């Protein structure tokens, strides 16, 4: 099928929500798009307009036993992804990072030996995550959010393209300068954190 894109994502909203936004953009512009994620990431996909495929995935953290369990889940996710992608045969695959993107991305690495497709990475953070680092070698392009030095080897730097962050927010957020001036005698500061850091930061205050 022409114009068929699969997107790999998972874990936290920081990975999933931008992928949902970009996937919806593709669908609105005539592409077929399927999202592959894990059970944890699925809760952020309610606004996605296409099909969502759930696979097994896990972090490799904790004690030895839990790392073994994690490896088993990643292998199962790889097998699920390989069978699913063999059936679909997309032209384009795009990873938005997280541990859940590893199984389908490794499946793409295998499939690229037999079918023609392009594989891309989008990195949302100022430091490239572990999952995306593993995949850089096999990526045709690396899309990033910030214009900065990502400390990559010279042979990979030419793959980088600054595109910014896909977002579900349609309207710009503006501040009320009059409100700030009314309270100019009070010391005011703004706290902002990601999905893993915002609650702990706010609890400190």
Regions found by a protein language model. Name each.
Residues 2, 7-10, 25-73, 163, ...:
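Conserved nucleotide-sugar phosphate-binding/catalytic loop shared by glycosyltransferases and other
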Residues 63-92, 110:
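An amphipathic, basic-hydrophobic alpha-helix
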Residues 32, 111-175:
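Active-site-proximal region of nucleotide-activated glycan assembly enzymes
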Residues 5-6, 81-100, 117-122:
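Short N-terminal targeting/anchoring amphipathic segment
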Residues 7-20, 199:
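A short, glycine/small-residue-rich beta-strand->loop->alpha-helix junction that serves as a flexible
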Residues 40-43, 90-112:
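An aromatic- and histidine-rich active-site surface loop
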Residues 2-3, 91, 185-187:
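Nucleotide donor/acceptor-binding cores
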Residues 36, 41-50, 173-205:
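Donor-nucleotide binding loops and adjacent catalytic segments primarily
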């Amino acid at each position: 099928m022409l114009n068929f894109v699969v997107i790999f994502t998972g874990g936290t909203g920081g990975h999933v929500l931008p992928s949902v936004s970009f996937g919806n953009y593709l669908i609105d512009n005539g592409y077929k798009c399927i999202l592959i994620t894990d059970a944890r990431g699925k809760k952020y996909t309610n606004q996605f307009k296409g099909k969502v495929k759930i696979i097994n995935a896990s972090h490799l953290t904790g004690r030895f036993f839990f790392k073994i369990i994690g490896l088993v889940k990643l292998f199962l996710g790889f097998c699920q992804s390989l069978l699913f992608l063999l059936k679909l045969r997309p032209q384009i695959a795009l990873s938005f990072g997280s541990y859940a993107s590893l199984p389908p991305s490794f499946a793409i690495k295998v499939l690229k030996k037999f079918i023609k497709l392009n594989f891309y990475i989008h990195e949302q953070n100022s430091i490239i995550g572990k999952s995306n680092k593993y995949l850089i070698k096999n990526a045709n392009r690396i899309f990033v959010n910030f214009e900065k030095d990502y400390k990559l080897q010279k042979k990979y730097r030419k793959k980088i393209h600054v595109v910014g962050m896909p977002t579900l927010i349609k309207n710009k957020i503006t501040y009320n300068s009059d409100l700030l001036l009314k309270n100019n005698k009070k010391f005011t500061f703004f706290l902002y954190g990601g999905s893993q850091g915002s609650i702990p930061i706010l609890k400190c205050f």
